[in-house]
Amino acid sequence: MISAGDLRKGTTFEQDGQVYVVVEFLHVKPGKGAAFVRTKLKNAITGAVTETTFNPTAKLQEAVIERKEMQYLYTDGELYYFMDQETFEQIPLNYDKVEEAIKFLKENMFATIKFFKGEAFSVEAPNFVELLISHTEPGAKGNTTSNVMKPATLETGATIQVPLFVNEGETIRVDTRTGEYMERV
């Protein structure tokens, strides 16, 4: 059991036979009345998002989540295919289950798939990935010492902010949890 006061982004719990993932949370302590936790929850299986408030002392059933490292193979436009490295079984996933991770995944990269009662519901990219910059505007000469950022499109199609000195065709390391540039490789 976990306390509602301990809810954080990414926490999973079971309620009414469904598993929920906390998308947003806010601890509210009004001047008058009891404190409460306002949350935005995503149903891990259906993808439906709901807003719910909890008493911070309320107890929630922790969901048993299985994590499995799988290899991203390809997409056919609608489904994204991942392969289990032990059984070589392929599982297709809809875009709504991979939307956060797919921005940073290339074919043949490994990702962590989360399962609840045998059904995949979420994909996590590795914390750091190395990706090629497919397009960015050239930086102006003399602007390399400042902390100014510019948009860059990665080989996966994601757009992130990079420093001015980073050029098209270079490989960079990206933190997939925040979507931020880390360093040139």
Curated annotation (Swiss-Prot):
Q: Which UniProt keywords apply?
A: Cytoplasm, Elongation factor, Protein biosynthesis
Coiled coil ranges: none
Q: Which GO MF terms are attached to this record?
A: translation elongation factor activity
Q: Which PROSITE patterns match?
A: EFP (PS01275)
Q: Which InterPro entries match?
A: Elong-fact-P_C, NA-bd_OB-fold, Rib_uL2_dom2, Transl_elong_fac_P/YeiP, Transl_elong_KOW-like, Transl_elong_P/YeiP_cen, Transl_elong_P/YeiP_CS, Transl_elongation_fac_P
Record SUPFAM superfamilies: Nucleic acid-binding proteins, Translation proteins SH3-like domain
Give the matching Pfam families.
Answer: EFP, EFP_N, Elong-fact-P_C
Annotated GO biological processes are:
peptide biosynthetic process
Q: What is its main location?
A: cytoplasm
Which GO cellular component terms, listed alphabetically, does the Swiss-Prot or TrEMBL entry include?
Answer: cytoplasm
Its domain of life reads Bacteria
Cystine pairs: none
Is the keyword Cytoplasm assigned to this protein? yes
Q: Where in the cell is it found?
A: Cytoplasm
Q: Note whether Zinc occurs among the keywords.
A: no
Q: In which pathway does it act?
A: Protein biosynthesis; polypeptide chain elongation
Q: What does this protein do?
A: Involved in peptide bond synthesis. Stimulates efficient translation and peptide-bond synthesis on native or reconstituted 70S ribosomes in vitro. Probably functions indirectly by altering the affinity of the ribosome for aminoacyl-tRNA, thus increasing their reactivity as acceptors for peptidyl transferase.
Q: Which family does it belong to?
A: Belongs to the elongation factor P family.
PANTHER family per the UniProt record, alphabetical: ELONGATION FACTOR P, ELONGATION FACTOR P (EF-P) FAMILY PROTEIN
Put simply, this protein is called: Elongation factor P
